[in-house]
Amino acid sequence: MSEKGTRWRPLELFSAYLPAALSVLLGACLYITFSVGQWRSLDVPSWDLAIFTEAAKSYSHFQAPIVPVKGPGYNLLGDHFHPILVLLGPIYRFFPSGLTLLVVQDLLIAVSAWPLVRLATKQAGWLLASIIGIGYVTAWGFQGAVASQFHEIVFALPMLAWASAAFVEGRWVATMAWSAPLVLVKEDLGLTIMMIGLILSWRGRDSIKSFAYPLFFAAFGVIAFVVTIKLLLPAFNASGTWAYSLDGSQGRGNVTLIERALWPSQKFGVIAMAVLGAGIIGLASPWFWVILPTIAWRFLGSVDYYWDWKHWHYNAILVPILLGALLDAHRRWSEREQSDISRGLGWVISRQRPFVATVALAIPCAAALITAPQLPMWKMTNPGFGAVSSRMAQVQEINSLIPENANVETDL
């Protein structure tokens, strides 16, 4: 190796990993700062944190996740199927606080930036990758998740991020390996696995083996979903049923499936942000359609929280998938492959595709910047954000009066 090559190699390694490392660090700092601010100001958007804190406490003592907040003797595995939450047990044992769960969630979201920003660095260089990383960690879906506090779906984010990167790189086995544990996160993610299997089969259709094996993976996802909602959830639920329903027609009268999917109009906000999150050109990647099962159950459901794009945790799971679709389209456009993408979008002539692909990488970051004032973390610009609530002393006094292991009934 030449002296020049030896001298520049450390710099090349530094620039190769720096955007991903800084993205993870930026995300962790932003999220944890926001969570600590919420904690200090007693900002409680829902009862989810109390529910999952009780589950973590039970797991930390090697007990079933009995959650009195949901009802006497209520087993949380009968609500949603999320056995992966057992991983919270050892952490909670050493740091027994609801704030622990918030920090765990913040770190899991931040870490999910690593594989995708690393991939972006390989494809587009450190500068564009840095822009992508900023857009990723400040994305609409993640802000809503952090603000609404802990939810089990956060465990799916690193899995989907690494699966997305593997898909773009054409590593089918790795894609399936990273996706398979999704069945341990939440019951509906079996349908996401089904979609991933179908997409892999489509992408590998030129080979019998590459076409057939992903179909078995898709079947695994369907079977996992059916077994979970028909057998496992009813077994843990006191009423012997699945606590939720795919029927979203309640309260909507006699409407068609299309009307249920597209009405009310606030759903278009989610669609618009998804398109921007994929840099527009990501729609041409088959990976974009991995979001379809999640979008379907949300839009067909009757709970208006499902349709919101600014708040709650429901959009977080879309973010790594959308960036994966963008990077997949970018790779193929940049290489000027005569692929399904170039044929499907023939209005973009061959010499324009690399330029359009490069510009598209900045769209998610631009969307994050434009929508920032409407998103939860904008609160951090307020001078009083994170100040200790005036009610804190009263809360601490009341807590001191409650005996250990006593149950207290209250509202939010």
Give the ranges of each region predicted by the language model.
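Perimembrane helix-loop-helix junctions
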Residues: 1-7, 192-219
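Start-transfer (signal-anchor) and selected internal transmembrane alpha helices
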Residues: 1-33, 172, 212-217
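Signature aromatic-anchored transmembrane alpha helix within multi-pass, membrane-resident enzymes
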Residues: 21-25, 127, 218-222, 333-375
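Extracytosolic helix-loop segments that constitute the early lumenal/periplasmic catalytic or substrate-binding loops
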Residues: 51-75, 83-84, 206
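Transmembrane-helix motifs of polytopic, lipid-linked glycan transferases
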Residues: 99-123
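Specific aromatic-rich, kink-prone transmembrane helix
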Residues: 115-118, 135, 154-178, 193-197
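Hydrophobic, aromatic-rich transmembrane alpha-helices
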Residues: 267-295
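Hydrophobic/aromatic-rich transmembrane helices and adjacent perimembrane loops
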Residues: 289-347
